[in-house]
């Protein structure tokens, strides 16, 4: 019984750590996450949406726009978190 309670508490604490639980799909559909001062290439929009959410949780701005294709050179790479 104690093991079940510990397991439930563990799962609850892991879930409470992040609100960014969107599924990341495995399809290859390159997109670029755009911010005024940086860009980030991602394998697909779901990946970039999750990175954007995690950035917001860490007090950084989320992506303004996601555009199809790879990012253009000229801006630095955005940090993941």
From Swiss-Prot:
Location(s), subcellular: Secreted
Tissue: Main cells of accessory gland and seminal fluid.
Biological process annotations from GO: sexual reproduction
Organism domain of life: Eukaryota
Reported effect, residue 39 to S: In strain: SFS 3.4
Primary subcellular site in the record, as a coarse category: secreted
Cell membrane keyword on record: no
Keyword Nucleotidyltransferase: no
UniProt keyword annotations, A-Z: Behavior, Secreted, Signal
GO CC annotations, alphabetized: extracellular space
Signal peptide: 1-16
Described function: Responsible for physiological and behavioral changes in mated female flies.
Annotated protein name in UniProt: Accessory gland protein Acp63F
The species this protein was found in: Drosophila melanogaster
Taxonomic lineage: Eukaryota, Metazoa, Ecdysozoa, Arthropoda, Hexapoda
Gene name in the database record: Acp63F
